[in-house]
């Protein structure tokens, strides 16, 4: 779809990455890190047009001289000034449109505090003057993008992991599980266990290097104990070239890092359920008649589900928890890194959806709380 007058802006603001583009497109046009960078030392930045704030890729490329901050933590905006800068960058520098002329669909994690959603609404209508707004629940959008109306979505991004059962298009809020453990926690754990190799990572810039190591080299062990035994016998190391040209060898850290997704106690979250338990607990909170169908449609979504072997390990562990007659089916769409965005693109281009937008006139009349009436 051309970015004509009719197309809406779809913006999936993740804790780690912003995905932005136009409704009707099959993929986001712009994907950049949700980071805002400020110079550590103003003198050091002389001659670079003296900008005081850098956003996204530009902040990433200058990370050596900047202090980087993520305004979204665990799916909740913790710094609204920086969040506004990210949205401004999205509209004017990336999708390059005037938000006053396009409806905007934003996304958020389930069980977010109400005031988070109200503040998003307020900024969109008052700062950016958008004509209409909709805020969609991330997991529900992912299910739409997989072409299903019934299933349980396990959505794991950078800040939050949640399991959301959906039946005939309706999410079942009483059965949602949310754990504030996701990709960023894996990166921090990897930073910690990489110290065993003799390399220390401490700065915000070095954290980004470790995130790259995680995304490029880590995988899930199908059997953790067996993998540990094997790695003790043969190193199974992979080389990773650091930005300064030095090469670092990464060994059993490659599978110990994502193991956190199955054993959150590794990072001190003793009470938190791992991925298999989250799915199992969510399904068990649903009506007995829909459980079998949910077990047959476990849909993965988000960047932290991209690890090699994760779908297979998840299916194996869920079938150990589920009743013996049930054969769980884990669906891992190849585009699942962006399935929240794709679902938003599909939803906002449906003619039947057009009555769902919160209009500026409704906002002016009722204030930010209007968003709870129209966005579920």
Swiss-Prot record:
GO terms for cellular component: cytoplasm; cytoskeleton. InterPro entries: Actin (IPR004000), Actin/actin-like_CS (IPR020902), Actin_CS (IPR004001), ATPase_NBD (IPR043129). It comes from the Eukaryota. It catalyses: ATP + H2O = ADP + phosphate + H(+). It holds the Pfam family Actin. Actins are highly conserved proteins that are involved in various types of cell motility and are ubiquitously expressed in all eukaryotic cells. This is Actin. It comes from Leishmania major. The lineage of its organism: Eukaryota, Discoba, Euglenozoa, Kinetoplastea, Metakinetoplastina.
């Amino acid at each position: 779809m051309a970015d004509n007058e009719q197309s809406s802006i779809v913006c999936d603001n993740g804790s780690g990455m912003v995905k932005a583009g136009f409704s009707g497109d099959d993929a986001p046009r712009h994907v950049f890190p949700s980071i805002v960078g400020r110079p550590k030392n103003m003198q050091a930045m002389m001659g670079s047009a003296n900008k005081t704030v850098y956003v996204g890729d530009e902040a990433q490329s200058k990370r050596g001289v900047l202090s980087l901050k993520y305004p979204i933590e665990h799916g909740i905006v913790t710094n609204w000034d920086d969040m506004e800068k990210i949205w401004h960058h999205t509209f004017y520098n990336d999708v390059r449109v005037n938000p006053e002329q396009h409806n905007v669909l934003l996304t958020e994690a389930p069980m977010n505090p109400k005031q988070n959603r109200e503040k998003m609404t307020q900024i969109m209508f008052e700062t950016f003057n958008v004509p209409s707004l909709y805020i969609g629940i991330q997991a529900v959008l992912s299910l739409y993008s997989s072409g299903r109306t019934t299933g349980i979505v396990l959505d794991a991004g950078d800040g939050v992991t949640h399991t959301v059962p959906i039946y005939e298009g309706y999410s079942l809020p009483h059965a949602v599980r949310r754990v504030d453990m996701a990709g960023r926690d894996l990166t921090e754990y990897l930073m910690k266990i990489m110290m065993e190799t003799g390399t220390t990572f401490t700065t915000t810039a070095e954290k980004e290097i470790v995130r790259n190591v995680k995304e490029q080299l880590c995988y899930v062990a199908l059997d953790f104990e067996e993998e540990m035994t094997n790695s003790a016998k043969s190193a199974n190391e992979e080389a990773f070239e650091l930005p300064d040209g030095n090469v670092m060898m990464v060994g059993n850290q490659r599978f110990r890092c994502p193991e956190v997704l199955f054993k959150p106690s590794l990072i001190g979250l003793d009470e938190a359920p791992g991925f298999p338990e989250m799915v199992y607990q969510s399904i068990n909170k649903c009506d007995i008649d829909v459980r079998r169908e949910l077990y047959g449609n476990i849909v993965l979504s988000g960047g932290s589900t991209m690890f090699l072997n994760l779908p297979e390990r998840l299916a194996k562990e869920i079938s150990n928890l589920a009743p013996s007659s049930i054969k769980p089916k884990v669906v891992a769409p190849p585009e699942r890194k962006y399935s929240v965005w794709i679902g938003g693109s599909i939803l906002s281009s449906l003619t039947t959806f057009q009555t769902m937008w919160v209009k500026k006139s409704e906002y002016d009349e009722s204030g930010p709380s209007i968003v709870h009436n129209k966005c579920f």
